[in-house]
Amino acid sequence: MLSPDLPDSAWNTRLLCRVMLCLLGAGSVAAGVIQSPRHLIKEKRETATLKCYPIPRHDTVYWYQQGPGQDPQFLISFYEKMQSDKGSIPDRFSAQQFSDYHSELNMSSLELGDSALYFCASSL
């Protein structure tokens, strides 16, 4: 919906200055991985936290980022609450796994280039 206070060109420019973060498979799907929030739009330089609840009894969590028109990029993984592998995760991002095995991906100082699909997976 367009803002009545801004001409179309100004609205488009303002929209381009926002960062859109989406999670694949957000919500509950037949006892699979649960991710939240489903989608998120933030301003540049803001922070965001994405949550991943693994399949019950799975103790390993993997985070991925997929930018527009790109292949998924591995960010980081955890096994039994410890970081087990690190991929191309920006310094502005951090992640952790908690005692109930859910994980959070924290992103600070968001940039337009962070606009992407974020998803997590779990395994035994």
UniProtKB/Swiss-Prot annotation:
Residues 32-124 form the Ig-like domain. Its main location: membrane. GO terms for biological process: adaptive immune response; cell surface receptor signaling pathway. It holds the Pfam family V-set. Disulfide bonds join C52-C120. It is found in: Cell membrane. GO terms for cellular component: plasma membrane; T cell receptor complex. Keywords: Adaptive immunity, Cell membrane, Disulfide bond, Glycoprotein, Immunity, Immunoglobulin domain, Membrane, Receptor, Signal, T cell receptor. Transmembrane segments: none annotated. InterPro entries: Ig-like_dom (IPR007110), Ig-like_dom_sf (IPR036179), Ig-like_fold (IPR013783), Ig_V-set (IPR013106), TCR_beta_variable (IPR050413). Alpha-beta TR is a heterodimer composed of an alpha and beta chain; disulfide-linked. The alpha-beta TR is associated with the transmembrane signaling CD3 coreceptor proteins to form the TR-CD3 (TcR or TCR). The assembly of alpha-beta TR heterodimers with CD3 occurs in the endoplasmic reticulum where a single alpha-beta TR heterodimer associates with one CD3D-CD3E heterodimer, one CD3G-CD3E heterodimer and one CD247 homodimer forming a stable octameric structure. CD3D-CD3E and CD3G-CD3E heterodimers preferentially associate with TR alpha and TR beta chains, respectively. V region of the variable domain of T cell receptor (TR) beta chain that participates in the antigen recognition. Alpha-beta T cell receptors are antigen specific receptors which are essential to the immune response and are present on the cell surface of T lymphocytes. Recognize peptide-major histocompatibility (MH) (pMH) complexes that are displayed by antigen presenting cells (APC), a prerequisite for efficient T cell adaptive immunity against pathogens. This is T cell receptor beta variable 13.
